[in-house]
Amino acid sequence: MKITLFFLLFAFTSFGQDSPRVEEKKKAEAIAKQHLQEMQGGFLLVRLDDKKTEIDYYLKYQNDDEAKKVKEKQEKINEQIRLAFTKYFTMCPVYFFYMSDTRNLLDKNYEMMNITDALLQSVSSLDLSSGKFYVAEFGIANQDEVTNDENVNDGVYTERMAVSALVIRTSEMLELRDPFPYFVRYNIMGGVKSRYLGPVKKMQEKLNAFGAY
């Protein structure tokens, strides 16, 4: 009789409490939902490569023709990225800045940054000091991840192979974590006019689906 009561009490206690694994999963989901809400109430900064280091190198050695080629090629790519976000991204307002301003962003020298809209018009009214914004770019997703639910309990993370992707980061350029849909793979060899449209569209769809979850 005592043994039966013991097992009943044990079973009741076990079912009445979530395991550490479940608690960690709930915590991760709550953090991800909070990021989504903050994004909806804030804005997105898209980092564009301006090839400044490469262009400055050619200019240093008076190779103006090569510098011009690099600049024009990158401008065409950036134009397609701006077009993709304008056409498909509706989660929050989107603005753009160049990679050469990354140090200003990280050092919070926001007044030194050149931020523009999709039409390349300078935007000076944004409040970056609040930190209520996220950064996106076509780059590399290489964050560690929990590969299955069992690993959540003991905090074991395995390194994900770095992949070319559209990535969303925090205002401090840190990658978000699952289950937030923070990256979408893309084909760096695809045609310039179609390379960026698909990933941005898919990112918006994933954000919509996560918000409805």
Predicted feature descriptions by range:
Residues M1-E23:
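Bacterial Sec-dependent N-terminal signal peptides
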Residues D18-Y213:
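Short beta-strand and adjacent turn/loop elements
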